[in-house]
């Protein structure tokens, strides 16, 4: 019995010694990172990237991984969605005229603690203390914008195109209605007005007239469309395009302006494929006594890139110019106002007049984008955007597609898809199924209305950013034609052709999708980023 007990004791001791040895060895492996299993399980994504790239890490990839690592530590689903969006954008040809790809430097400028600072007011005139660095950022962005566009003054606070148009409208109303009224009443401030006097001023604000391009002819919602606040602020008198040519008729616009006598003559577009003669608009504005305002949100990049110069440069001729900072300008999602000195003080009151304050981190990104745009490389890019648009337009026309105004001078075109027996919405849906993003767009005086539409709006800014050229535009046109020819209207429950449903030939879908992916494989979005690594680390 004693022998058995001793043997059991020795076995137990040996087992404990073995366990202790294993524990010590695991500790050594952990300490020296010699265990691949432990390293994979416990290392961070950034450490994994650095160990995988040898002695040549990419600064862009390091920054991106570090950023996503921070995000994933709080909410992995958001990090996964960001990576999935990269995958999505790498998998689709982006032909939406209002979209582009901003640089990784622009993106990085937005991701910092500047977002934490309130900065109501304008530089060196803030309602909050501690804004010295936000002032520096805003003034730098404004200087870059003024240098880029040759503007008297730049106001870089607005968050969107709609916001910036509202600020511009109220700045003009303040300059041309409010200030004369205060002078007439012999007071210096709105706060000095009696209730009755303020009511009279409000009435004068509401009686002003706006003349902008009709929404159905390529104008924007904020240019006096009835469903938008602009038509409720002003008495809206939209002008159109010639029904035969689809072009602006300057003589007809002048005649209308002389009859209407608007406070604001507004030009600019979201779906007009030709350049605008702003010198001619200046002449019309002077003749009818209007303030000339231009919304160049869509083509600001073509102005910055010196494609539109002389009579076609809005900054040279307009009193007030508004623009977004994304689209052709390739900046962050935001906006700004460029104006003559006469309107600078009024524009500066955008906060608190319309805005609650700026987004400092976005203003920082705007400064980066403006700096990027003020280079020979960007001017070359802007020229290529138009060359690609014209190449795509010609290729589509060679395939029998009718284009509004018979071509384009800028970054976009309007294609009539009714010859394929489709509405714009059906064409949009079919293209997306094959990996091409476009948007349905009404043609002037469209019988299908503003929702179903008869057209597609196609733009080349994003494809040009990827590096595509005129040869690729021919392939894109061929893909569009192939998909639309292979699509028929779907049927309603009653068996009648529907305006929204489609019947896409599966063989066409497969063939077109392969062509799209073949094209995208040669022109990769953000090639600095290793998508497979990001998916492995952040998409679970």
Task: Give the positions of each predicted feature.
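Short, Lys/Arg-enriched N-terminal segments with co-localized hydrophobic residues
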Residues: 16-41
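PLP-dependent enzyme catalytic core of the Aspartate aminotransferase-like
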Residues: 43-64, 68, 76, 450-540
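Conserved PLP-binding catalytic core of the aspartate aminotransferase-like
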Residues: 402-470, 533, 537
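Short acidic (Asp/Glu) and glycine-rich catalytic loops that position anionic groups and cofactors
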Residues: 85-91, 116-123, 262, 343-348, ...
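A glycine-/small-polar-enriched, mobile loop at the entrance of the PLP active site in fold-type I
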Residues: 90-101, 112-139, 269
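Conserved PLP-enzyme active-site core in the AAT-like
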Residues: 140-400
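Cofactor-/ligand-binding subdomain signature composed of acidic, glycine-rich
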Residues: 48-88, 109-115, 124-128
